[in-house]
């Protein structure tokens, strides 16, 4: 189901995202995982763990910002 899918994870730098991202990459081989978070420092720290994986992308934003969220959702198959 998630194989070759594009997945957006809101609050992706939190505890759920830190567990979900590596497990999903390994188990389901998605086309892309977008980590959507408003915390730039946490994104920078998390990016170091996935620097060799081109499937992982980071998107700065807040779910309360409708326009930013709309841009992040472009081409997304699943939202977590």
Regions found by a protein language model. Name each.
Residues 10, 36, 79:
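SDR active-site strand-loop-helix element
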Residues 5-27:
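N-terminal Rossmann NAD(P)H-binding glycine-rich loop of SDR-like oxidoreductase domains
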Residues 8, 34, 59:
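Conserved Rossmann-like nucleotide-binding pocket used by diverse enzymes
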Residues 44-46:
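Acidic helix N-cap motif at the loop->helix transition within catalytic regions
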Residues 25-42:
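Conserved glycine-rich Rossmann-like NAD(P)H-binding loop of the short-chain dehydrogenase/reductase
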Residues 48-52, 57-78:
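Conserved Rossmann-fold cofactor-binding substructure of NAD(P)-dependent oxidoreductases
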């Amino acid at each position: 189901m998630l194989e070759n899918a594009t997945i957006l994870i809101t609050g992706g730098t939190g505890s759920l995202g830190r567990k979900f991202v590596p497990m999903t990459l390994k188990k389901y081989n998605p086309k892309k995982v977008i980590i959507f978070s408003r915390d730039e420092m946490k994104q920078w720290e998390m990016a170091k763990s996935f620097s060799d994986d081109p499937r992982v992308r980071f998107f700065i934003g807040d779910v309360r910002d409708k326009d930013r969220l709309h841009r992040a959702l472009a081409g997304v198959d699943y939202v977590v």
